[in-house]
Amino acid sequence: MQFLPLFHKLQGRPVLVIGGGEVALRKARLLSDAGARLRVVAPEIRSELQELAGADGICLRGYASSDLQGVALVIAATDDEPLNARISAEAQAQGIPVNVVDAPALCSVIFPAIVDRSPLIVAVSSGGDAPVLARLIRAKIETWIPATYGQLANLGKRFRDRVKQLFPDVQQRRVFWEDVFQGQIAESVFAGKPEEGERLLEERLAGAAPRALGEVYLVGAGPGDPDLLTFRALRLMQQADVVLYDRLVAPAIIELCRRDAERIYVGKRRADHAVPQEQINQLLIDLARQGKRVLRLKGGDPFIFGRGGEEIEQLAAEDIPFQVVPGITAASGCAAYAGIPLTHRDHAQSVRFVTGHLKDGSSNLPWKDLVAPGQTLVFYMGLVGLYGICEQLIAHGRSAATPAALVQQGTTQNQRVFTGTLETLPQLVAQHEVHAPTLVIVGEVVTLRDKLAWFEGAQGSL
């Protein structure tokens, strides 16, 4: 190990930055965030850097050895290599930590790549050998640690002394904090409810038993590509005890769930419901009452034709804790991967999402509104009733030559896209054996696919 990771408290302490350009500015921003008192020396100094240092911290001249007097840290950020080497030698001779930007051999300290969730700080370093790799690893860590971890750390800080008094034994304290940071208290903070998290922690310290009640996570899995999951969705997927998933959730996404979680298929298709909706609702309640963390995983977005509202209505009625994580809805994801912008200044000023399968099985849609000019229509679950949809749109005034598209299994390697018109779309379904899940897009924007298509599945498109 070439460098020992340490954290340097710089609040109120003088730090010398030699250099006045972009590199010096980047270092100065970081030092300012840490509360350091900046002293910047350079013949020319950028205005933003001058603002950071203040009038008393600016010296518009070259470096002098006397500048090192009384400083806690030195940063050499000039493009003069001999000068940088001199600064390094003089600082180290006086026992002052020194960092020479992009010259690890001249450094006694180096800057790591930082994930800032203050007061929680994560530092990643390659010892100066591969800084780009360190930044890439930092980016991965950024996705694993929600921004609200800082709030959770602050909550722990406020209660630390009380917990220490209550649990003098180190092992007992460790078990207590592990439960806090991995359980309902932490989830309340992550869900944007810090007051609830603090209340639950107060209850625990007052002697209340841990809640036996679990929680339900209603999570949108997006249209199929696992890369389109949100950070929060992925985190909850990896900590749930039980997963209830729909037919439209891609297998690759299900595989990202916790390995030892129980998986329950509750998918539906037309006239074939593996588990009736009422039974799904009750199952969510029963599992949560067993103290389990229950993931309800739905394709697309749970609040757009996903019956998510119905499910959480039941949870709310039974006082079951829940949180909702939106997902990229099929219209957005599939249209983007098909190269079809849903709105465009020259073609469509609005877009409508329409279900092609209503609760009573009818197609009683506001057809007069749906044929208004300047809009794009996106039909979910419209494949079975496609002939009737096209017929009604034409009958109510939409031109039979209106461009239209079918996007099957959009955003995945199995994606297929077929373009035609309202008149020819039903024929394309039969000709190419198109099957669900397929999205129907109607409007002039479909013509842009010829220029904007950028993603093709393994089976190609027409």
From Swiss-Prot:
Disulfide bonds: none annotated. The keyword Oxidoreductase applies. Signal peptide: none annotated. NAD(+) binds at E22, V23, P43, E44. Residues 1-201 are annotated as: Precorrin-2 dehydrogenase /sirohydrochlorin ferrochelatase. S-adenosyl-L-methionine binds at P223, G299, G300, D301, I304, T329, A330, M381, G410. GO terms for biological process: cobalamin biosynthetic process; methylation; siroheme biosynthetic process. Keywords: Cobalamin biosynthesis, Lyase, Methyltransferase, Multifunctional enzyme, NAD, Oxidoreductase, Phosphoprotein, Porphyrin biosynthesis, S-adenosyl-L-methionine, Transferase. CDD domains: SUMT. Gene3D superfamilies: Cobalt-precorrin-4 Transmethylase, Domain 1, Methyltransferase, Cobalt-precorrin-4 Transmethylase, Domain 2, NAD(P)-binding Rossmann-like Domain, Sirohaem synthase, dimerisation domain, Siroheme synthase, domain 2. It comes from the Bacteria. It catalyses: uroporphyrinogen III + 2 S-adenosyl-L-methionine = precorrin-2 + 2 S-adenosyl-L-homocysteine + H(+); precorrin-2 + NAD(+) = sirohydrochlorin + NADH + 2 H(+); siroheme + 2 H(+) = sirohydrochlorin + Fe(2+). Then it catalyzes the NAD-dependent ring dehydrogenation of precorrin-2 to yield sirohydrochlorin. Finally, it catalyzes the ferrochelation of sirohydrochlorin to yield siroheme. In the N-terminal section; belongs to the precorrin-2 dehydrogenase / sirohydrochlorin ferrochelatase family. In the C-terminal section; belongs to the precorrin methyltransferase family. This is Siroheme synthase. It comes from Ectopseudomonas mendocina (strain ymp). The gene is cysG.
